[in-house]
Amino acid sequence: MDRRHLYFLLFLLCTIQAAIGQQRSFSIKGVVKDASSGQPIPFANVVVWNTTQGAVTDSTGLFEISGISPGSYRLQSSFLGYKPFVTAEFRLANKDIFFPIELEEASQNLQEVSVVASPFRKTAESPLGLRVIGFKEIEKSAGGNRDISRVVQTFPGVASTAAFRNDLMVRGGGPSENRFFLDGVEIPNINHFSTQGASGGPVGIINPDFIREVNFYSAAFPASKGNALSSVLDFKLQDGNKEKFSLRGVLGASDIGVSANGPLGKKTTYQVSVRRSYLQFLFDMIGLPFLPTFTDAQFKIKHSFNPKNELTVLGLGAIDDMKLNTGMEDMSEKNQYILSYLPVVKQKTYTLGAVYKHYAGKNLYSVIISRSQTNNKNIKYKDNDESKEENLSLNYRSDEIENKFRTENTFRLPFIQLNVGGNIEYAQYTNDTYQKQFTSIPRTIVYQTDLGIWKWGIYATAIYESYNERFTASLGVRADANNYSSDMNNLLDQLSPRLSLSYRLSDPLYINANIGRYYELPPYTTLGFKDNEGNYVNRTNHLSYIRSDQAGLGLEYRPTSYLKFTAEGFYKHYDRYPMSILDSIPLASKGTDYGVLGNEAVSSTATGRAYGLEIMGRWYNYKGLTFIASYTLVRSEFKDGRNMDTYLPSAWDNKHLFTFSGTYSLPKNWDVGAKFRVVGGAPYTPYDVEKSSYVEAWDANNGLYYDYSRFNSERLKPFTQLDIRIDKTFYFKKIMLGAYIDIQNILNSKYKEQDVYIKTGKIINPEAPVYEQRYELRPIAVSYTHLRAHETRRHL
């Protein structure tokens, strides 16, 4: 960032600071309800966490805490016969707010032990691998840029890739092994310009202003959340303000947006947002070879018919358009290399969903319906020259449409809670592909796909808590199937049992364990791949669900309500993973490039394993301080098709991950934060320069080929990065103004990749036959500094 720009911003902050008069105070209103029945709880205690300010609910469960200054808060609620509860963090800005609280019924003899309310949560179903991420961590995390995928990289077990990507590699798993839920509605991806068949991209889609909290599972996945092998991100969204209308504007370093929320009558609330990027101008100014533009929109409407029935309708959509910056004046060799292989990408995606909940005594019935569509287009021409049709090397167009119906039911009995449910889905996958390839000879892949798949599944979970809640156990089972082929249509072939245990050794010390078997359906790109004769190659190859057996054991120590330490060991075994027939490597080591993953012939023969140890300390918002310090020792290995007797490192075998991230709240609404991250060197496969130099080979691929006979035989150097952030929030009579400076990689550390080659355009043997002609290739060094600065102003 230019120093004059920085000085001007600091001067502006101080000038606005001097113009502020005395802050007003507001009220926090809400209702306390039984989590099972939805009935209001009268005379419950509600206090602002870590303060003495509070209130008692009236006979209808309503409460009001007045005289609260603007800022970020949590509420703590308790009542005899219920577990004490600390809410997610929320912001009180320039108006009163309404905040609902749900309390879970406690065991009959819980009053015999001392239970301290804490913002840290774990469940009987997921005592390991569950991290709850609050609003403030998303909002003010250094280097996070208010993007949940970047914030998650702070937690143990999560590796990251090169700059400008949000890929999630959790506990040694690949980027295609994650699932995402928005208030119970499954969404296909959470990133713009996402890699089809995986999950990564450069920028998040979800508006962070909508998020109340995120449950991040890296193990012990709930039986209701199927089709995941590495992680589940379960987003809990805020409701619209029940009291007053509010408007918010966001001006960032890369986008501009506006959102609104408020009441629609006495029983209905809403929130809606629209965002538009101007990254193409920024990237053009700093000389990047690609120019992305994105637009996204999001909404949520919630209607309460009565205390026993409620309906939520939500939607999320994005339009992405990435062009190549071929007209750059200063065309560096690195930019030439990127332009040589990067396709033009156009994507459209949306999800519409509805969640209906009915409270019946101590039971809860839920019905979830949704429809999602992802349209993806990738086009590439040789030397980016569109003047000649023969220069076309890739024309890929596909649609993924999913229609889903799911029911979830919770029954509460003495000491036992039962969760049962099922789902039925219909997916439509269409594809029109033209792609040039080169193996030992050039060839062209041309096919059209129109594939319809019915999918179904059932699950059940029984949760037990001892009379004093010293011991909890959860036994779950899930089964999935579909009509793609006879290898997948039997529920018993995908039977997925899981068991979780937790025991309190003493008041602050717990031992937790989990073991389970999990299944994941390969991506539609793999299911729908055809050969030139129109045959579903992978159906013939007996493609099946990917299977992973996982186990974990951990200790959790909570000396106070705001501090905890955890140590968790894990082991994951993979089986039936798709193995590329062309490359003889597992698809598990692919998926962090722009484009498509899985559109090739495979066999379900790859096996692998990931294992390691995670250590974490977390201090949560006490006396203004919040921090996470974590270290992960992880190994991720697979067997390739050339040597089935030896495990080789996967692309996510970083070995060592260390992160420290913290924020500190200063007087007068200042916040400062920092994040320091060390990522161990990732393995890589050297390029096959000889093969790549053939004219027919290079022109087909528009770039280099890997030498898979030396699969991941080399390793990059470790990478370190320091990010810092300064926030200032101003509260006026009717406006809240927030500004921040977020400087990523302030030490200008370089992420060094393996050297690459570019063609000079010269054929070194023009007299040879066409199939023997070679380009002259020149090596260049590639590194990324990822130095970025952000400023944002928001108005309410």
Where are the predicted features?
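Predominantly transmembrane beta-strands of Gram-negative outer membrane beta-barrel pores used
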Residues: 179, 213-224, 230-238, 245-289, ...
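Outer membrane beta-barrel strand-and-loop segments of large Gram-negative receptors
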Residues: 393-398, 402-408, 446-453, 457-459, ...
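C-terminal beta-signal and adjacent terminal beta-strands/loops
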Residues: 575, 669, 677-702, 716-721, ...
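Periplasmic N-terminal accessory/gating domains of Gram-negative outer-membrane beta-barrel systems
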Residues: 83, 89-93, 116, 120-222, ...
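Periplasm-facing N-terminal accessory domains of Gram-negative outer-membrane beta-barrel systems
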Residues: 21-112
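Face-selective signature of the C-terminal outer-membrane beta-barrel domain
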Residues: 302-320, 342-488, 504, 563-566, ...
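Gram-negative outer-membrane beta-barrel transporters
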Residues: 465-468, 571-573, 592-686
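Surface-exposed extracellular loop regions of Gram-negative outer-membrane beta-barrel proteins
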Residues: 191, 327-334, 430-437, 507-550, ...
